[in-house]
Structures are given as C-alpha cells and as structure tokens.
Regions:
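Charged, low-complexity intrinsically disordered terminal segments
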Residues: 1-174
Length: 174
C-alpha cells in the first residue's frame, strides 16, 4: 500500500479479462470497487463461467451485509454465487480456466486491496492447479446456490438488508 500500486486487484482484473471459460473464486469478504465489480460482470456477460463462493455464516455481520449488496448486480450479469453452508470460509482463491490461479491473503474487499500488506502466489502451468479446482468443486458441493432474487439473497432478513444498504455509502472505510 505504500507505493500506490494495486497489484492484487490488477492481477484479479487481468485474470478476469483474459478468462475464456471459467473463473472460480472463494473469498470470505466481497466489498468491491466499481472496477472489480465491472470486471466480474463483464467476464460473465461474455460467457465466462464466473462463480463465487462466500461464507454462509459470517464472522463480521457488517461485512456480510455489505457483501450481499453486490449480489443482485452480479447475479443479473450471470455471475453465479454460492454460500458455503457449513460455516465461515476464510479461503482466498481464484482459478482461471484451470490454467492459472492466485492463492494468498488477499480478500476481495477494499481494505485488503488498498490498505493492508497482503500477499499471494500467482501460479501458471503447475501441477497443483487441478487440485485447486477440485477443492473448489468439493467446496461448491457443500454450498447453497443464491438465486437472482431479493428473497434468495437476503432470506427475509430485512434489518440485514437495511444495514447493508446504509453501509454501502461508507464501504471504503470498512
């Protein structure tokens, strides 16, 4: 963060822009800026299978509420969202076309991308990529699919919805 470079976000956006078939992501937090949200949506709109796995049970209610404010715009563009039902997942993984992956400490949230000292490993053409994809699929098997409806996203939690909408105005601070 001290050099002003947004390396983590730029790598994620680059993978999304170069993807031809799939981008599979597991992240505990989803607090997106416009550029990253646009890259996710654009990839899905051009036919890439973009699939996010997020926690079904939050560790931070405010971050959870804020993440859900991104669901409907993403879903409306064809991004698939699933929530891991056994509990909270803290994995940070992105795998693109089964050929490249990023695994590390970088969350898909503003603080992680802009303010924290995070790191990750970018991999291409290495033997562990099939295992990373298999782990995504195994995790997906334990998920609830989020449908592109308010009811599916918010599950009748009106207070959580209200909190999320209010927090969206101060998202960069969270």
């Amino acid at each position: 963060p001290l050099d002003g470079e947004r390396v983590g976000e730029m790598v994620y956006i680059d993978l999304l822009n170069r993807a031809r078939h799939s981008v599979h992501i597991i992240t505990p937090y989803l607090i997106l800026d416009g550029e990253l949200e646009t890259a996710l949506r654009f990839a899905a709109e051009r036919g890439v299978d973009v699939h996010l796995i997020l926690p079904g049970k939050p560790d931070k209610v405010f971050a959870y509420a804020l993440a859900k404010t991104h669901y409907l715009p993403l879903l409306s563009s064809g991004v698939k969202i699933s929530e891991w039902t056994p509990g909270f997942t803290h994995a940070k993984v992105m795998i693109m076309d089964g050929q490249e992956a990023v695994v590390g400490t970088i969350n898909l949230d503003y603080r992680s991308l802009y303010h924290h000292f995070e790191n990750a490993v970018w991999m291409r053409g290495v033997d562990c990529l099939p295992r990373i994809e298999a782990d995504f699929q195994d995790t997906l098997a334990q998920c609830r699919t989020v449908e592109p409806t308010r009811q599916s996203v918010w599950q009748g939690k009106k207070l959580l919805h209200l909190v999320g909408m209010v927090l969206k105005f101060i998202a960069p601070l969270i």
